[in-house]
Amino acid sequence: MPVTLEVSNHVAYVTLNRPEAMNSLDPESTADLTEIWARVRTDPDIRVAVLTGAGEKSFCTGTDMKKSPPPTECMAATYLRDGQPILPHMKMWKPIIAAINGYAVGGGLEIALACDLRIASTNAKFGLTEVKVASLAGLNGTQALPRAIPQAVAMKMLLTGEMISAEEALRYGLVSDVVEPSALADLARSYAEKIASAAPLSVQATKQAAVLGKDMPLEHGILYSHLLWGVLRDTEDRKEGFKAFGERRAPAFRGA
């Protein structure tokens, strides 16, 4: 299958499985990915997702231009009916971790930018190279990259199509960790299991406060956080958390 899904211990492991094509996205893999994100978003057993690419060379290099058919209708009809094919389906309050195991280029970097936590192997490369093929980083790249790293660096990448290394990505704050390729999967699993062991509603509310709050004035963001704290106050999981703390045991959260 061009995209695989494995669920273990409340973690969804999503793998782009076209290593022979640098894990680029053709119509079939795009459709698979859309279905998988719908499952991740709605399955109550899944609390966090890890996205990576198969093999050791590439996370994702965006659209497979060799397998992308020419458009059969005007842009307006396609956009107004379907919108974007992938990123809207990643919009959820469950966290998504990108384990970037090689090239994250074009749409591949844009997908990584839509994730909440990005970790990388030492051989990873990052770039939005669309200007080199007379295109534009239209999924989210022109907007998300300048918000993720310093403006000057983002503009250099966008306008020249130059790539940066994993070490540079770490220095600019595009990723939180860089490890040897052999250690990447274990690090992703460690972070995912830590998140999955926390109270699901608390994790989702925390993500919501952080994501929505950054577009609010500070005072409004703080007030919104207070509101979410109140929403969580009477949950069964919060009661369980306090009880487990008093009994010196691990809490058994249920997402209720």
UniProtKB/Swiss-Prot annotation:
Induction of expression: Induced by toluene.
pH dependence: Optimum pH is 6.2.
GO MF annotation list: lyase activity
Catalytic activity, reaction form: (2S)-[(R)-hydroxy(phenyl)methyl]succinyl-CoA = (E)-2-benzylidenesuccinyl-CoA + H2O
First-level EC class: lyase
InterPro entries linked: ClpP/crotonase-like_dom_sf (IPR029045), Enoyl-CoA_hyd/isom_CS (IPR018376), Enoyl-CoA_hydra/iso (IPR001753), Enoyl-CoA_hydra_C (IPR014748)
PROSITE patterns listed in its UniProt record: ENOYL_COA_HYDRATASE
Pathway assigned in UniProt: Xenobiotic degradation; toluene degradation
UniProt keywords, alphabetically: Lyase
Entry function: Involved in an anaerobic toluene degradation pathway. Catalyzes the hydration of (E)-2-benzylidenesuccinyl-CoA to the corresponding alcohol intermediate, 2-(alpha-hydroxybenzyl)succinyl-CoA. Also accepts the N-acetylcysteamine (NAC) thioester of (E)-benzylidenesuccinate.
Subunit structure: Homotrimer.
Name assigned to this protein: (E)-benzylidenesuccinyl-CoA hydratase
Gene label: bbsH
